[in-house]
């Protein structure tokens, strides 16, 4: 019973909020346009207008028809969207419907088997046995159907409301467009067509500039070869002693020359003999004192002259230092060492000069015997 009540309520709601069908929309638009057209033709102002009205009809009648057709298309679109939404929702309930069909079929099969029995006892016994099972299954089916009906009612109602709103909006837009066009048509019939403004001459299109030739793509530069990794510098070796420079190319080895005989070492120079010490000069012999002459007054003896100092011995010249031997150059054959120059012989010391002999004292002059001696 509950199922039937829900179904009746759904039908009532749908009848109240059902959207207009495409045919209904088309008929409503036609009636609206016809009504406006008759109103326009019956207008006193339009009837007093001039005869130049054909151009106005030629201009605005196609526009009015196009506006009505656009409104019909918009309404058809709304109806199609609503139908698609309803089909989508019904597809969702198909799975539940199939499961309920299986349960309903089991009830029908059980009760149908009872109807086919001819024996009265068997007939009532079958109904008694299947009644309890049928009631349980029917209760489950009823509950499931009630839930689905409530859900579908809400969903389908919302779909119908959206469709009606979309259709009404499309119809109102079509009415607004047709009203505006009828108003313009009325003004055109009363005042005539406005003089068309001279269309501005289209400016000559500028000649397209020749497209610049595409520059040839630069050839891809060859990728620079990776620089070789610098070899690790060898550790500095200790400087070897200077050796003869190696020849750039190995020449054939010459036959071994006989090794030069070692030069005899120079004999050591004889040391110079020590100079003999000068002999001491002999002291001069004392001169004999002259005999004193009888004089009244003896003259004092002259003092002996001082002996001349002996000249200092000249210092021996220093021996010249022997020149250092030149280092042998790195050559295949060493040069012989130069012989040291012989040291110069020391000059002999000059012999001491003999001391001058003392001059003899002058003899005393003899006094004249007379006082007058010329």
Curated annotation (Swiss-Prot):
Cited Pfam families: DUF725
Signal sequence region: 1-19
Biased composition (Acidic residues): 194-363
Domain of life: Eukaryota
Main subcellular location of this protein, as a coarse class: secreted
Compartment annotation: Secreted
Chain ranges passing through the membrane: none
Residue numbers spanned by region 86 X 2 AA tandem repeats of P-E: 194-365
The keyword Repeat appears for this protein: yes
One GO cellular component term noted in the UniProt record for this chain: extracellular region
Protein name stated in the entry: Protein TsetseEP
UniProt keyword annotation of Secreted present: yes
Keywords (A to Z) from UniProt: Repeat, Secreted, Signal
Region ranges (Disordered): 192-374
